Structures are given as C-alpha cells and as structure tokens.
C-alpha cells in the first residue's frame, strides 16, 4: 500500500537542494535562453548613462564609454524619440539637443575624473607627498584638457538647435541650451580657471622638489 500524499509543499525539494544531490530540479536539465537587450541606437546608449550618489573613476569611465559609443550610432525612428516631435524641424532640433547634452555629459565626466586627481587647496604639510602630488596633478591636467573639445562640440550643437524656435519636452536640456547660447553657462572659462589654479599648485610642488631632490621619489623609498 502506497504512502499517503502529503498536502504540504516539500520546500527542501523545491528550493533548498544540492546541485549534485539525489534531488535535482527538472528545470536544471532544460536548456534555457538568456533574454538580453542589446543597445542599437543613440538613445539606447544615452539611457545607459547613470551616476550613483557615491561614484568613482570606473563609473565615470563607463559613462564616457557609453556616451562616446552612442554619438556614433543612428537615432531611433522619430515616433520612438525621447519626446514628442511634430515635424522635421523639431526632429532636427531634437537630434542637435541630444548631441549637445551628450557632449556636455562627457565633458562633465572628464572634469569629475580630473577633480579626483586635483586638490582644492595645497597646504604646506601636503608637500611631504610632493612626488605623488606632482604625478597626480599631471593626470588632472590631462583630463581637464580632454574635456575642452567636448565643450566646444556642445556649443556648436547648442547654436544649431537654437535655429528652431519651438521648445521640446526634454526636461532641463532646453535650459542647458539657453544658458550656453546666452553665456550664462560657460565651461570654457571654468576649465581655464581649473587649469590656471592647477598650474600654480604644480609650480609650488615642482619648486619644492627642486629644493629637495631626495623627495622626488615614492615616500617608501625615501
């Protein structure tokens, strides 16, 4: 006589089981397909952009990669745009606004990376690490300069998109365009200011290293 079937669910059998044990889920023997999404259009790569509250260089480089890749892709069909577009003029403005905004985001990402190698203030006791500071400031200088071409591209596309009078429902992107063409938002001046102050700090560090040659090597080797 067979044992009565228990109405209770065998949780150990269904959920807590050993991979190579006597009980194996039938689904483990069934091949399955991973449904993955592959970005194809410029908007797809733009939507991959994101920045957490606490971010580091890796997150910034990831965003730069997605945005740069997106700039080389074609746009979605107008009916799938990120905002309603009523005619060809609005679609022209839409494309230029996205080009402008993505170049701005790349520029900002480069500036954020540069700021991680820069120092807002250089105090006298920081010169104990003059060797490391000198190398760090050199990296910061490179990233600040890397941001400049993307600011110029953003200006170019802001001017082009301003040829169309109608406003698009793209959040603050229209505000960015207006502030760029009116000069209220001028990252060219901001970057120049960062580079100018960085050059003064680099000069201070290099003068210290010239006066203290023994300090021009890693701290552990001094």
Regions found by a protein language model. Give the residues of each.
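Short coil/turn linker motifs that delimit alpha-helical repeat modules in TPR/alpha-solenoid proteins
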Residues: 88, 95, 102, 129, ...
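Gram-negative bacterial Sec-dependent N-terminal signal peptides
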Residues: 1-2
């Amino acid at each position: 006589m067979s044992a009565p079937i228990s109405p209770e669910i065998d949780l150990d059998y269904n959920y807590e089981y050993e991979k190579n044990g006597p009980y194996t889920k039938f689904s483990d023997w069934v091949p399955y397909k991973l449904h993955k999404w592959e970005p194809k259009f410029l908007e797809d790569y733009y939507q991959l952009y994101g920045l957490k509250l606490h971010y580091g260089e890796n997150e910034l480089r990831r965003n730069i990669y997605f945005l740069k890749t997106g700039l080389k892709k074609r746009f979605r069909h107008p009916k799938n745009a990120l905002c309603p577009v009523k005619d060809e003029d609005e679609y022209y403005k839409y494309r230029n606004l996205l080009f402008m905004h993505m170049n701005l985001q790349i520029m900002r990402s480069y500036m954020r990376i540069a700021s991680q190698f820069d120092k807002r203030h250089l105090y006298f006791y920081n010169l104990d690490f003059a060797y490391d500071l000198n190398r760090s400031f050199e990296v910061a200088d490179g990233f600040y300069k890397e941001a400049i071409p993307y600011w110029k591209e953003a200006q170019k596309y802001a001017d082009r998109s301003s040829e169309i009078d109608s406003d698009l429902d793209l959040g603050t992107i229209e505000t960015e365009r207006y502030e760029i063409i009116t000069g209220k938002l001028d990252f060219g001046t901001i970057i120049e200011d960062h580079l100018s102050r960085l050059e003064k700090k680099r000069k201070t560090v290099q003068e210290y290293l010239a006066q203290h040659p023994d300090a021009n090597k890693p701290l552990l080797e001094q």
